[in-house]
């Protein structure tokens, strides 16, 4: 319905649709709107018993995708009353439900959404938020530093705790569990939690800084997860962790627990690339960013640009803006098709991890700014002189680059020299620079923005 007048209370969704040969794209868009709201494959007499014109979603615009033959941007508006308040499970059952299996379309991807202000107000938002997290940690004016314990699996509890202690003592703010360490036979969660928190407390006492370790509470049931989170709280942890694969309802449940208990909630995006990486089918990661900010997580892995994982610079900037801005404007090069007022939901901290090292510090600060957690796993634990030396190299590199930036220097072009100068008085940094030099992962991104000169979504 190209004549449909969009309401402020409408939820707007943008789909990238590739219809089957012979299927009209306008008809495909209308079918998507119907199936994701009230319609089925035929006319039913019970339509006469409802306000179908109100509840049926409206496909209001269809545009060809630039440089992509037979692919279309389909804009669909949903009335706010179609969705249960504060329920991500209900929202997603409609928006990414049956329509992704439609035979009439070869491929379908959810690219972006605009959440109405009134609906956003029914979601909790981040349990702690960036501002309060910095106040609790007493750390300002720079990115936070972290590392993932390696190897991910197989360490004993005591050796695991030793890694945590050495990394934090060397200068990191956080250590973390990885996504697939839960409570396996080689190390049950209680053992890991106890030794990890011993390392946290020892390092905090020695350095005088607030330290933390992301204790992964992911489990088979909500009862297991609450039990693990409660144990982490009893041990004095300031932060717990969950994986995206636990599902939207479990994520919201843990976010509410974290708000009640004054805990920071870290989310590892394990599993997202199974549906977010390919350009033609699935959903864009920016939508996951929006949903996770709504659901209430405080941290989410959102890309590094220069690391080993998928990440186009413009797209990642769009992810970071989605997580951090109070109002997001339309920005097509960054893949942001809708303006979004975040209804005062707290900021969610992006996390950069995967194949980064101290020699890239100037690039990381340039691309990602201060409001980020930089996590150097292999870039800490792979240091030839040990874990503590790796942590020290990262901390010295970060502080040298922040000082140079604050002094007004061109830290981007001078970055390598700034690092070399800092390494003159820091042996661990010199060793790291000699080892990793300018290693980076330069591959063509599989998911880049479709730049359109004329904004297609200003409504």
Curated annotation (Swiss-Prot):
Sorted UniProt keywords: Calvin cycle, Carbon dioxide fixation, Chloroplast, Lyase, Magnesium, Metal-binding, Monooxygenase, Oxidoreductase, Photorespiration, Photosynthesis, Plastid
Site annotation Transition state stabilizer: residues: 308
UniProt similarity note: Belongs to the RuBisCO large chain family. Type I subfamily.
Cited function: RuBisCO catalyzes two reactions: the carboxylation of D-ribulose 1,5-bisphosphate, the primary event in carbon dioxide fixation, as well as the oxidative fragmentation of the pentose substrate in the photorespiration process. Both reactions occur simultaneously and in competition at the same active site.
Active site: 150 (proton acceptor), 268 (proton acceptor)
Cofactor binding notes: Binds 1 Mg(2+) ion per subunit.
Highest taxon, organism lineage: Eukaryota
InterPro entries hit by this protein: RuBisCO, RuBisCo_large_chain_AS, RuBisCO_lsu_C, RuBisCO_lsu_C_sf, RuBisCO_lsu_fd_N, RuBisCO_lsu_N_sf, RuBisCO_lsuI
Localisation per UniProt entry: Plastid, Chloroplast
In-chain residues carrying the UniProt-annotated modification N6-carboxylysine: 176
Catalysed reactions, semicolon-separated: 2 (2R)-3-phosphoglycerate + 2 H(+) = D-ribulose 1,5-bisphosphate + CO2 + H2O; D-ribulose 1,5-bisphosphate + O2 = 2-phosphoglycolate + (2R)-3-phosphoglycerate + 2 H(+)
CDD domains in UniProt: RuBisCO_large_I
Annotated organism of origin: Calyptrosphaera sphaeroidea
MF term (GO), any: ribulose-bisphosphate carboxylase activity
Protein name: Ribulose bisphosphate carboxylase large chain
Subunit structure: Heterohexadecamer of 8 large chains and 8 small chains.
Main subcellular localisation: plastid
Pfam families assigned to the protein according to its UniProt record, in alphabetical order: RuBisCO_large, RuBisCO_large_N
